[in-house]
A protein has these predicted regions:
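Intrinsic-disorder-associated, low-complexity terminal segments enriched in Asp/Asn/His/Tyr and depleted
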Residues: 12, 28-29, 33-34
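Catalytic/RNA-binding core of pseudouridine synthases
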Residues: 18, 39-284
Length: 284
């Protein structure tokens, strides 16, 4: 009975927090005219017109090869074109590498103030990892620089090793990353051939699951906290297996409650936004 009361109290507090946070990521509604265009319930404000200056939150499925900056620029261009304005504040809530695909949250206008909030939501990834070889960037951006034995690796060993990466872990970010080193981006220094030393960061891996094991390739599902580099996780898994590893594919399938199926391909954004009713703003 005591446990039941405690659980009820926790659930009550949680529900209150969700309510006072404006439903946050839990409640969202599908926009008209496109099955993959999703917006927060708080965005409707009693109507269906979109007000990008006041603030809208858009969900995109970033294509392979696109930078996060390109997704933001593409959205900004077509929004400004429709609104007939020269500028609009637009930003994203979490970078994806060019070789990764998946969920990107893009905020406009006053909604950009919520970017930090969105960044702290849990993220889910599907990662394909090649064992037995490494690259300087821990992915396919660079050529293989070393090979390692894999004959000793079995499915059972992989499953046991993955268990070591759940909970709080220390992770050293990749040298080819946006981390700052003495006021400069780490990737700028790394591309110049300079040695980059980055300090380990405390992260949380909520879940890690082996989906496929076709050695020397494995596919895993990872649920993790803000700041986790899946490329670095692949590196660490390889080392823990007394081998090497690098990432060959990565898809971000969820951010908070926003799933990949809720997202719009940026290539479809022009057609979608041309079918929407917008609040037209002056003086931007």
């Amino acid at each position: 009975i005591s446990c039941a009361k405690t659980m009820a109290s926790v659930l009550h507090q949680l529900c209150n927090e969700i309510w006072f946070q404006g439903i946050r990521m839990v409640s969202y509604h599908r926009r008209r005219n496109h099955p993959s265009a999703v917006a927060y319930g708080t965005q409707f404000r009693g109507g269906v017109m979109m007000d990008f200056k006041e603030g809208e939150v858009l969900y995109f499925n970033k294509p392979l090869g696109w930078t996060s900056f390109k997704v933001v620029g593409h959205a900004r261009y077509h929004i400004c074109r429709r609104m007939k304005v020269k500028k609009l504040k637009v930003g994203h809530a979490g970078t994806l590498d060019p070789l990764a695909t998946g969920v990107m949250i893009v905020c406009t206008g006053k909604a950009t103030k919520r970017i930090e909030e969105f960044q702290y939501h849990t993220k889910e990834y599907i990662a394909t990892i090649r064992l037995g070889a490494t690259t300087p960037s821990y992915d396919l951006e660079h050529e293989i620089d070393a090979t390692y034995p894999t004959e000793h690796i079995t499915r059972e060993l992989v499953e046991e090793t993955l268990k070591k990466f759940t909970g709080e872990i220390q992770q050293v970010p990749p040298a080819f990353s946006a981390c700052m080193v003495n006021g400069k981006r780490a990737y700028d220094l790394a591309r110049k051939g300079e040695e980059v030393e980055l300090k380990p960061k405390l992260l949380v891996i909520d879940e890690i699951e082996l989906l496929e094991c076709n050695l020397p390739e494995i596919k895993v599902r990872v649920v993790c906290s803000k700041g986790t580099y899946i490329r670095a996780l692949a590196r660490d898994i390889g080392e823990a297996l007394h081998s090497g590893a690098h990432l060959t594919a990565l898809e971000r399938t969820r951010v908070g409650d926003v799933r990949i199926e809720d997202c719009l391909n940026p290539l479809d954004f022009k057609e979608w936004i041309d079918g929407q009713d917008l609040v037209m703003s002056d003086g931007l």
